[in-house]
Regions:
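Small-residue hinge/turn detector
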Residues: 5-17
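Glycosyltransferase-associated regions of secretory-pathway enzymes
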Residues: 1-5, 20-172
């Protein structure tokens, strides 16, 4: 997964465009959300904040990313990923991935950046692109639940991230 993370960062930096995980469902065009933006990441629900080890206002991931070619923040990500020695992390392999190439790496870079640099990075609000947390997505997909709670989550949604995380199976 770390190689794939690095490849998508390189591709987005060089060519620009949009990357979306396979476990996303598009409900409607996100064009109104991203119009005029140069770098975007999808925000995650608060219930996913556990383990990051840092108090932050907004938690986001690399499951949906958009940027123009040569965006400075994407360049910063690439530099950090390829300069990381990796031998500093004595932790579970899942956490290691999150910290070296995944969301925790991105969030540390984002929150360590100057506020003036962060203004150019749009964190797409969770109600638009990640209306469900992990447990809600399981109830919606696997149990086919159609409760008022879940339906209310979808009222403003442009996309749904189901958080299948198939890559976790590979890192046992």
């Amino acid at each position: 997964i770390q190689r794939w993370d690095a490849i998508r960062y390189l591709f987005l930096y060089r060519f620009g465009g949009m990357y979306v995980d396979f476990d996303y469902e598009s409900i409607r065009s996100i064009e109104p959300l991203i119009k005029g933006k140069t770098c975007c990441f999808s925000e995650e629900p608060e219930t996913h904040k556990g383990g990051f080890g840092r108090e932050v206002d907004r938690y986001f991931n690399n499951g949906m990313m958009l940027c123009v070619p040569n965006h400075p923040f994407m360049g910063k990500i690439i530099e950090a990923v390829f300069s990381d020695k990796g031998d500093l992390y004595d932790m579970h392999r899942f956490d290691y991935v999150l910290r070296t190439t995944g969301p925790w790496k991105l969030m540390n870079l984002y929150y360590d950046s100057k506020e003036s640099e962060r203004k150019d990075i749009y964190l797409i609000p969770k109600q638009y692109v990640t209306p469900f947390d992990y447990n809600q997505s399981r109830r919606f997909i696997l149990e086919k639940e159609r409760s008022e709670e879940l339906e209310n989550c979808l009222k403003d949604a442009y996309a749904i991230h189901y958080f299948f995380s198939n890559w976790r199976k590979e890192i046992k």
